[in-house]
Amino acid sequence: MKREELLVEEIKDLTLEELKGYADFYKILDKVYGFTAESVVRGVKILKDMIKEADLRFLSFTANLVSTGLRGLFADLIKQGYFNVIITTGGTIDHDIARSFGGKYYKGLFEYDDSMLRELEIHRLGNILVPMESYGKVIEDVVRKYMNEIVSIKKEWPVYELLWEFGKRISDENSILKAAYEKKVPIIVPGIIDGSFGTNLFIYSQFTQLKLNLFEDMKLIKDLIFSCKKSGALIIGGGISKHHTIWWNQFKDGLDYAIYITTAQEYDGSLSGAKPREAISWNKIKPTSENVVIYGDATIILPILSASLLG
């Protein structure tokens, strides 16, 4: 196949506005009830309770979702004040910057020949196609363009403040970084160096006095945890973003509300597959908490949960 035959239909971001007509869709699932439908309905109830009752509300997600149309939905959830702390992975920053500064991602298929894609200089992320020129070079150019100006302000940065500086310089209304900057919602990325953005910061630091101070990010979370009355989390996916969220909540005896959206299973003992009941044994979720695991693809589940907030 030719490159132009593959890169046809661009990924577009979803907004809360587009979900207005689906606010009651979860009620249909409540009629169906069986199996996953029940857990989605329970998730809607817990999410609404959390937003109403918890003063500290975490949104935790993995980077792969930012390559999809969920990126715009994440931005809107921040803009509307539903969440006031974001915990995510290094790739989230990569994809958000790449797409904010002209990078285009395209619809594809899982089944494409990856050797062919490599020859055509196209990355594959599941069934999403990322032209090479839409990813690494875009991020490298953005870091090079803005870092001299940012380092002239100060040389040592907490990661969340550095990300606000980049968000300040983004005009794309679907950007997660822009939304977080405008609402002053901290984005905590414990694995910031694991990705293109972090690697470019490292390279830049070799020629300047740039320093990242992750302890300041930890201090911020510590202060938020110890000052809150109730905390809740919508945790999408697993890995470091999930663990960092529940880890810090053990210091207040656990989350009061927890919603997991996952496809991971617990039989292998992984953190990603661990259910809320296991986190209870670690004091990361309260025994009295409202909690649920929703098994399914977040690109389907999250729009349903988000739409319910509009009803």
From Swiss-Prot:
Example of a GO MF term: deoxyhypusine synthase activity
Active site per database record: 284
InterPro entries: Deoxyhypus_synthase_arc, Deoxyhypusine_synthase, Deoxyhypusine_synthase_sf, DHS-like_NAD/FAD-binding_dom
Recorded catalytic activity of this chain's protein: [eIF5A protein]-L-lysine + spermidine = [eIF5A protein]-deoxyhypusine + propane-1,3-diamine
Pfam families for this protein: DS
GO cellular component terms, A-Z: cytoplasm
Cofactor(s) required, per the database record: NAD(+)
Coiled coil: none
Keywords, ordered alphabetically: Hypusine biosynthesis, NAD, Transferase
Pathway(s) served: Protein modification; eIF5A hypusination
EC code: 2.5.1.46
Protein's job: Catalyzes the NAD-dependent oxidative cleavage of spermidine and the subsequent transfer of the butylamine moiety of spermidine to the epsilon-amino group of a specific lysine residue of the eIF-5A precursor protein to form the intermediate deoxyhypusine residue.
Family (UniProt): Belongs to the deoxyhypusine synthase family.
Entry protein name: Probable deoxyhypusine synthase
Protein source organism: Sulfurisphaera tokodaii (strain DSM 16993 / JCM 10545 / NBRC 100140 / 7)
Gene name of the encoded protein: dys
